[in-house]
C-alpha cells in the first residue's frame, strides 16, 4: 500500500475531482484528474468502487488490483494531480486482473501527463 500522502482520504478531495476535474475514459474505467494549483509535485489517488460493481468480495478484489497498479506504476503518474478511478458498471470483477488495469489505465495516465504538458506549453486547456 502506498503512503497516506499518496491517497485521497477526505470527501472534499473526491468532490473537487468530480466537479472540476477532467474525465478520461477507457472501456472499463473512468479517471477523474484534477491538477492541484501550487501543490507539491506529488500525485494522489482515490478509488470509488460502488456496490453496483458487486458484493464486498468483488469490490475488494477490484480495489486490491487497482492499488497494486498504482504501487507498481507510481513513477509513471503525473505529478501535482489528484486522480480518482471509478470502475464502470459493466466491469466483471471476476475478470479484473493487473494486466487489464495496466492495459487500460497506463495509456490514460500517459494521456493525462501529455495533456498537462500541452496545457503548460500552450497556456490553454
UniProtKB/Swiss-Prot annotation:
Pfam families reported in the protein's UniProt record: Ribonuclease_P
Catalytic activity: Endonucleolytic cleavage of RNA, removing 5'-extranucleotides from tRNA precursor
EC number assigned by the record: 3.1.26.5
Molecular function terms, GO-annotated: 3'-tRNA processing endoribonuclease activity; ribonuclease P activity; tRNA binding
The keyword Cytoplasm is assigned to this record: no
Keyword vocabulary terms for this entry: Endonuclease, Hydrolase, Nuclease, RNA-binding, tRNA processing
GO biological process terms held by the UniProt record: tRNA 5'-leader removal
Keyword Nuclease carried by entry: yes
One cellular-component annotation, GO: ribonuclease P complex
Top EC category: hydrolase
InterPro entries: Ribosomal_Su5_D2-typ_SF, Ribsml_uS5_D2-typ_fold_subgr, RNase_P
Function: RNaseP catalyzes the removal of the 5'-leader sequence from pre-tRNA to produce the mature 5'-terminus. It can also cleave other RNA substrates such as 4.5S RNA. The protein component plays an auxiliary but essential role in vivo by binding to the 5'-leader sequence and broadening the substrate specificity of the ribozyme.
Assembly and interaction partners: Consists of a catalytic RNA component (M1 or rnpB) and a protein subunit.
Family: Belongs to the RnpA family.
Protein name: Ribonuclease P protein component
High-level lineage: Bacteria, Pseudomonadati, Thermodesulfobacteriota, Desulfovibrionia, Desulfovibrionales
Amino acid at each position: 500500500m502506498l503512503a497516506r500522502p499518496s491517497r485521497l482520504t477526505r470527501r472534499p478531495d473526491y468532490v473537487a475531482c468530480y466537479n472540476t476535474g477532467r474525465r478520461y475514459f477507457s472501456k472499463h474505467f473512468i479517471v477523474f484528474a484534477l491538477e492541484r494549483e501550487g501543490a507539491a509535485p506529488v500525485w494522489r489517488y482515490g478509488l470509488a468502487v460502488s456496490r453496483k460493481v458487486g458484493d464486498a468480495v468483488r469490490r475488494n478484489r477490484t480495489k486490491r488490483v487497482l492499488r497494486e497498479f498504482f504501487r507498481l506504476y507510481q513513477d509513471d503518474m503525473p505529478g501535482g494531480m489528484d486522480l480518482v478511478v471509478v470502475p464502470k458498471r459493466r466491469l466483471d470483477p471476476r475478470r479484473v486482473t493487473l494486466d487489464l488495469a495496466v492495459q487500460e489505465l497506463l495509456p490514460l495516465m500517459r494521456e493525462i501527463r501529455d495533456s498537462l504538458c500541452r496545457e503548460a506549453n500552450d497556456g490553454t486547456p
